């Protein structure tokens, strides 16, 4: 008798979209909606760096495949940028252009994580990192960190407690999605020392590096280039999420292995999107970021003040504990009540063991829409 088809176990162990539970309900809302659930921007990319600004006459071959590592001029621009920001003498072999930061990080994880290996993840964390580890057959280990530690010593102790003989890497996202925290230099130096003592890889998710409002962003590569990977994204830096372009940097040998995985999944990042990324790096990108950073900082401060929580130090998010406002339906009921009022926020369990939290993105819609959405949320939490 033939064996019936079956599904592989790894995707069955992974979560689907973190938003699907509320979006159908939101779609049924008859009034204005406030999509504060997704980490995106309402702004268009810089003028001259949009898809409409690219022409075949100027860029013959823009609809053909790019080299798997990336368009050479873009690879060079990334190397130049990273050298300036980190002080590390990187070369082309240390970098590849990915189909977005998400794809790049997945390929790095696939290059360094073997089945049953563990990856310590500072939590709350970006939702998809757990899936990356599971795709490699590894085990994600949440480390309560943001909001749970308050010094270099407690930061190091929190991570060290979570390590086992199977731990191979530590994932650090700063500025943080979802908390808006920026990890201080002294804490990062402590984590680097810990990684060296335990011979761990360091995965630095730095896609919000340009959006720091208080404190400083410390590039991970500048602290431990021999064991660190840094992931960056045009999605967050330059408002190009739909283009799917980012880059990975790290030690040449494992970067080459990660590039193999990228080649066998997306082959290469979209050529036209890479051309737009090159334009933004060589042209108006810095000016766009300066203006955008000021707008984001203002929006974050206003949202935090209205909700009665501390201002974010970076990224584009607030992470709220709504436990006092939950009834017997738990967080699901809170999300349903929000959706019935036109508001979508992201559920806390997507970011780790946070069953009473929600995440708010204060840049995903124009400021007036965000303000009205924050008013709805303030009413729900009794502010």
Model-derived features: where do they sit?
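Short, conserved charged micro-motifs
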Residues: 326-334, 368-372
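PLP-dependent enzyme catalytic core of the Aspartate aminotransferase-like
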Residues: 80, 160, 340-344, 351-383
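N-terminal small-domain helix-loop-helix segment of the aminotransferase-like
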Residues: 3, 9-100, 107, 280-283, ...
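Conserved core segment of the aminotransferase class I/II
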Residues: 226-297
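Conserved glycine-rich beta-strand-loop-beta hairpin in the small C-terminal domain of fold type I
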Residues: 278, 293-304, 309-323, 354
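Conserved core of the PLP fold type I
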Residues: 62-193, 210-224, 229, 368-370, ...
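Helix C-cap/helix->beta junction micro-motif
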Residues: 29, 136, 197-198, 341
């Amino acid at each position: 008798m033939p064996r019936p088809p079956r599904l592989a176990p790894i995707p069955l162990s992974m979560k689907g979209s973190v938003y699907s539970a509320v979006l159908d309900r939101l779609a049924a809302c008859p009034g204005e909606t406030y999509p504060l659930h997704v980490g995106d921007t309402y702004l268009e990319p810089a003028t001259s760096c949009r898809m409409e600004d690219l022409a075949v006459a100027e860029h013959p071959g823009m609809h053909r495949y790019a080299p798997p590592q990336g368009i050479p001029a873009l690879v060079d621009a990334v190397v130049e940028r990273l050298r300036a920001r980190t002080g590390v003498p990187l070369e082309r072999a240390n970098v590849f252009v990915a189909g977005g930061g998400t794809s790049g990080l997945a390929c790095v994880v696939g290059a360094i994580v073997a089945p049953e290996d563990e990856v310590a993840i500072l939590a709350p964390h970006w939702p998809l990192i757990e899936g990356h580890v599971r795709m490699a057959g590894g085990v994600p280990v949440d480390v309560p960190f943001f909001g749970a530690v308050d010094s270099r010593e407690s930061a190091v102790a929190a991570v060290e407690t979570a390590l086992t003989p199977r731990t191979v890497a530590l994932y650090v996202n700063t500025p943080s999605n979802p908390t808006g925290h920026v990890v201080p230099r002294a804490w990062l130096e402590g984590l680097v020392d810990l990684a060296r003592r335990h011979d761990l890889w360091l995965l630095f998710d730095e896609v919000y590096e340009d959006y720091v409002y208080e404190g400083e962003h410390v590039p991970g590569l500048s602290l431990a280039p021999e064991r660190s990977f840094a992931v960056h994204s045009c999605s967050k830096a330059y408002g190009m999420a739909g283009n799917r372009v980012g880059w990975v940097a790290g030690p040449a040998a494992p970067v080459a292995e990660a590039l193999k995985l990228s080649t066998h999944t997306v082959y290469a990042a979209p050529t036209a999107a890479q051309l737009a990324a090159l334009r933004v790096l060589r042209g108006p990108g810095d000016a766009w970021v300066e203006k955008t950073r000021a707008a984001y900082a203002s929006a974050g401060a206003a949202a935090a003040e209205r909700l009665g929580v501390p201002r974010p130090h970076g990224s584009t998010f607030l992470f709220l504990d709504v436990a006092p406002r939950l009834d017997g339906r738990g967080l699901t009921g809170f999300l349903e009540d929000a959706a019935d009022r036109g508001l979508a926020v992201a559920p806390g369990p997507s970011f780790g063991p946070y069953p009473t939290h929600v995440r708010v993105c204060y840049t995903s819609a124009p400021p007036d829409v965000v303000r009205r959405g924050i008013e709805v949320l303030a009413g729900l939490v009794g502010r």
